[in-house]
Amino acid sequence: MPLYEHVMIARQDLSNTQAEGLIEHFGAVLSDNGGSLVDHEYWGVKTMAYKINKNRKGHYAFLRTDAPASAVQEMERLMRLHDDVMRVLTIKVDEHAEGPSVQMQKRDERDSRRERR
């Protein structure tokens, strides 16, 4: 089955448990349609570059899935209809990266930048 990565932004007025409940809910939608949620990360509340639906901040979540296209389309459709979800980005990948995403790594664990001139 194809592999996908999703980033979801939920409203800022949700609690952390409600935001993580959204991840579980959409994982259940995938499994009902023949897919699976391989891994997920809750990135927390972050400030956005511009307002979306009068919100300056949002709960960010990252999902790695292994699902057929029809399951992903159904999950995206339900995400767009859900009142608490403001934005969704889905990308098809060849393989999932090992370990935590770049957002979850500590700054000293990341590759260092080149030297300044």
Curated annotation (Swiss-Prot):
Entry GO CC: cytosolic small ribosomal subunit
A Pfam family hit: Ribosomal_S6
GO molecular function annotation: small ribosomal subunit rRNA binding; structural constituent of ribosome
Gene Ontology biological process terms, A to Z: translation
InterPro entries per the UniProt record, alphabetical: Ribosomal_bS6, Ribosomal_bS6_sf, Ribosomal_S6_plastid/chlpt, Transl_elong_EF1B/ribsomal_bS6
Top-level lineage group: Bacteria
Biased composition (Basic and acidic residues): 105-117
Chain ranges passing through the membrane: none
Keyword hit for Repressor: no
Protein role: Binds together with bS18 to 16S ribosomal RNA.
HAMAP family in alphabetical order: Ribosomal_bS6
Family, as annotated: Belongs to the bacterial ribosomal protein bS6 family.
Descriptive protein name: Small ribosomal subunit protein bS6
Species this protein is from: Ruegeria pomeroyi (strain ATCC 700808 / DSM 15171 / DSS-3)
Gene assigned in the entry: rpsF
